[in-house]
């Protein structure tokens, strides 16, 4: 149990997808204007990561891995296309659920919801799972932890951005300029966790 807790904490703080690996920056910067929208996208990314990492782990270990189906047959050259297909299917299902049950959030996310399919944070989580050879339980914990870390980062950035509307930001830095500086300072803050050994 301690191993899973340390894996979760590590994936949220030490190896944060957004602030340590800088993955998923497109939607991270574009949807971080309001906390409510950022939280909704963060939950969507967490759900997709929490489902796609373990599902892709099963696909990899039962079908694609060397010798999984037949001894001597290695289908790992199909990793990328298979993982992207699974992620795309999961995002389509999530999009239909949000459209039916949460139309306000669906409309607020707009074009960025289908873009979760090509969000490199999602694919990065799946790639890290293969690279680190996680089992199914570790994949579930890592997927949820990585999504939670990404959500924590985007909600924190949205909260800071909302507060900065009332600050006297120099004209040349308004918009993305001050956002990049803020993200850099947040990343420096998260670097303090890199010395923690779990």
Swiss-Prot record:
Its main location: membrane. GO terms for molecular function: oxidoreductase activity, acting on NAD(P)H, quinone or similar compound as acceptor. Pfam families: Rnf-Nqr (PF02508). It catalyses: a ubiquinone + n Na(+)(in) + NADH + H(+) = a ubiquinol + n Na(+)(out) + NAD(+). The chain crosses the membrane at residues 11-31, 35-55, 77-97, 110-130, 140-160, 176-196. One of its GO terms (biological process) is sodium ion transport. Keywords: Cell inner membrane, Cell membrane, Ion transport, Membrane, NAD, Sodium, Sodium transport, Translocase, Transmembrane, Transmembrane helix, Transport, Ubiquinone. Its EC number is 7.2.1.1. It is found in: Cell inner membrane. GO terms for cellular component: Gram-negative-bacterium-type cell wall; plasma membrane. Belongs to the NqrDE/RnfAE family. NQR complex catalyzes the reduction of ubiquinone-1 to ubiquinol by two successive reactions, coupled with the transport of Na(+) ions from the cytoplasm to the periplasm. NqrA to NqrE are probably involved in the second step, the conversion of ubisemiquinone to ubiquinol. This is Na(+)-translocating NADH-quinone reductase subunit E.
